[in-house]
């Protein structure tokens, strides 16, 4: 049995990711999001809201020369993210900030970023203590105790440059809510991918990209399947991890 706070190391596409078992560990949704985000040569500044152990920032650093900032509220988690950045030699392009994104107007400038990404807390918290984990730090990563999706969208709209992109991953049952929030804050939904555990199943996750002050036009891209007909991880998923899983 592992001790509380024990560290593990996971290999992801050639990178070594340090995690702690008493904090929310990265999962497939973060890996999917990191690979969903579109980056081009004009992308100079990227913000990763709620960076956790830094995995999304690390994925983006492998495919971009942009300046990446990951902001994380939980101090211990931000320390792990810094270690991951240093372990994988991305300290020249990734900066980790331990702060509350709600202080955005004191930390960042309006219209500062070309790209903003987030893997937000998925679940609403209504004050019912039975909803949450015994470990407060994990509950804060899974439930919107500290911040809501609407607050994240509103803040991102403020920080994005005109025609900048905002990408997020979320549970499929919140799709209507998320699309409504994006348009409310002038982030025009442009493309989406659905993720299924297997064929014949309902979608579990959605990945959406929205562009600030863009014209209308929406594309639903080819779906992602996690498992094939034999119950094995699909080649697409194996490729994301860079190894047999």
Each model region followed by its residue ranges:
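Short, Lys/Arg-enriched, disordered terminal segments
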Residues: 1-15, 105-111, 242-245
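A structural micro-motif
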Residues: 15, 44, 66, 92-94, ...
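SAM/dcSAM-binding transferase cores
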Residues: 201-245
């Amino acid at each position: 049995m592992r001790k509380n706070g024990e560290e593990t190391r996971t290999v992801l596409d050639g990178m070594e990711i340090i995690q702690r078992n008493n904090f929310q560990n990265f999962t497939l949704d973060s890996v999917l999001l990191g690979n969903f985000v579109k980056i081009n040569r004009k992308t100079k500044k990227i913000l990763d809201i709620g960076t956790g152990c830094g995995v999304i920032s690390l994925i983006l650093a492998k495919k971009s020369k942009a300046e990446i900032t990951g902001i994380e509220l939980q101090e211990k988690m931000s320390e792990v993210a810094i270690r991951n950045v240093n372990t994988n030699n991305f300290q020249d392009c990734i900066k980790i900030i331990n702060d509350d994104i709600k202080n955005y107007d004191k930390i960042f400038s309006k219209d500062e970023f070309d790209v903003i990404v987030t893997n937000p807390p998925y679940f609403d918290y209504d004050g019912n203590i039975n909803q949450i984990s015994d470990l407060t730090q994990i509950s804060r990563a899974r439930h919107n105790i500290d911040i809501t999706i609407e607050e994240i969208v509103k803040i991102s709209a403020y920080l994005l440059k005109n025609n900048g992109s905002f990408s997020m991953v979320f549970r499929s049952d919140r799709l209507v809510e998320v699309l409504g929030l994006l348009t409310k804050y002038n982030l025009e939904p442009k493309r989406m991918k659905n993720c299924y555990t297997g064929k014949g199943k309902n979608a579990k996750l959605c990945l959406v990209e929205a562009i600030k002050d863009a014209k209308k036009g929406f594309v639903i891209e080819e779906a992602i399947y996690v498992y094939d007909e034999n119950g094995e991880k699909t080649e697409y998923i194996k490729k994301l991890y860079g190894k047999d899983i």
